[in-house]
Amino acid sequence: MEEELKNLIKVSVSVIISISYCYYVPTRIKPGIFRFLSVLPICALFRVLPLFFASVHLSGYTALFISWLANFKLILFSFNQGPLFPLPSNLTRFICFACFPIKLQQNPKRRDYFFQWEYPIEVLFSNQFVTKVVILSVVLHMYNHIQHIYPIVLFVLYPLHLYLVLEILLKLFNAFFSIALDCELEPQLNEPYLAYSLRDFWGHWWTLMLPTILLPDVYARMRRITEGKMNSENALYLGVFVTFLVSGALHEFLFFYITRERPTGEVTLFFVLHGVCIVAYDARLKKKIARWIGFEFCPCLILQVMVMGFVVVTAGWLFFPPLVRTGKIQRFANEALLFIGFVRNLFNESLFFMRKFFNEALFFTGFVMRKLFNGALFFIGFVKLKLFNESSLFFIMRKLFNEAMFFIGFVIRKLFNEAMFFIGFVKLKLFTFGW
């Protein structure tokens, strides 16, 4: 754990310095091949950063956010395209938009909120989000009894686990950066179980950041290459197929960073299969399937069930086996449960510390109020008795001095005890979790 924390700090500093360089240096170069060459060393560095981690969460998220998304954003930025164009107004925004799966809302919706942060907070405390957090907790605990779960249930468990993790993580990112950057961000996951076709699933419901990256970088370039060499319909289908092929290869790299084993091609085949099915469905099968079912226009519910059934079955066949064989999906669950336990213990300890601090503060406030009240009564008595002779004045001064010294000593002692208690609490937590 200590080594992972050190590596996380090193990688974070490297990423911040690299993105800062991209903000100040390449922006002064004309868009095109020369700007691309100026960011190419940064892209090469980002490709190796996930290898610094042993944790599947840290290596997986670094590979997805930095090695994949940040690299593609920088490449598009080299040609004045993508989420980083136009250039964000300051370095902080540039770093956030480059390194995290967030995108500025181009046409912000008018909401009746006085503050920008009210809507993200409302989303996080909505019944829908809380329900998903509870379901994810149940799914994670099911891994403790995975040997007793039927294989057919695992076909549903793995996709559900992946969806809930991405949904919760992306919602947290959106809420945090909406508040931190004081802007409205586009949602990155849009209830994919409501999709009524594979094209709709991948283009409008699943992780929306990936299509915005792949469309201008792969699909649009493929359309330009094939322009004039084939008719527009075939060029469109070829562009879709190549986009899925590239996406499969990128996911293969992502799985390599997580499993650290030679790619088997199963993940690439998963995306190629989906690309072929989208092309075939749009080209030939759409009306035939509708007539075969008995509806010229299929009800949305039937289409949604068919789409999700196809995604779940093909994912269980091709997408998840590399993670299952290497035991990484079990490690995902174990690391998540360990982190949840750490947060829960930290929260309980923090509540204990805050309760103790509150009690001490009440006692201290009562003590001060008593001392002030006694001092006021003593002074009033002094005035009433009109003790203005020299001996009485000396007595009063000495008593006030003693009371002041006692009060100062009491305050210093209390502050010292609280500081020692807090330092001991922090040392105990760091020792408990091996930090």
Curated annotation (Swiss-Prot):
Keywords from UniProt, A to Z, are:
Acyltransferase, Lipid biosynthesis, Lipid metabolism, Membrane, Transferase, Transmembrane, Transmembrane helix
Spell out where the chain crosses the membrane. 7-27, 36-56, 59-79, 120-140, 149-169, 200-220, 238-258, 263-283, 300-320, 363-383, 406-426
The record's GO CC annotations read: membrane
* EC number(s) given by UniProt: 2.3.1.75
Which family is this sequence assigned to? Belongs to the wax synthase family.
Q: Mainly resides where?
A: membrane
Disulfide bridge map: none
Q: What is this protein called?
A: Probable long-chain-alcohol O-fatty-acyltransferase 11
Q: Which GO terms label this protein's molecular function in UniProt?
A: long-chain-alcohol O-fatty-acyltransferase activity
Say what the protein does.
Answer: Catalyzes the final step in the synthesis of long-chain linear esters (waxes).
Q: Pfam families given for it?
A: MBOAT_2
Q: Among its keywords, does the record have Acyltransferase? A: yes
Q: Which PANTHER family match?
A: LONG-CHAIN-ALCOHOL O-FATTY-ACYLTRANSFERASE 10-RELATED, LONG-CHAIN-ALCOHOL O-FATTY-ACYLTRANSFERASE 3-RELATED
Gene Ontology BP annotations: lipid metabolic process
What enzyme category does the UniProt record give?
transferase
**Record-linked InterPro entries:** Wax_synthase (IPR044851), Wax_synthase_dom (IPR032805)
Q: How does it sit in the membrane?
A: Multi-pass membrane protein
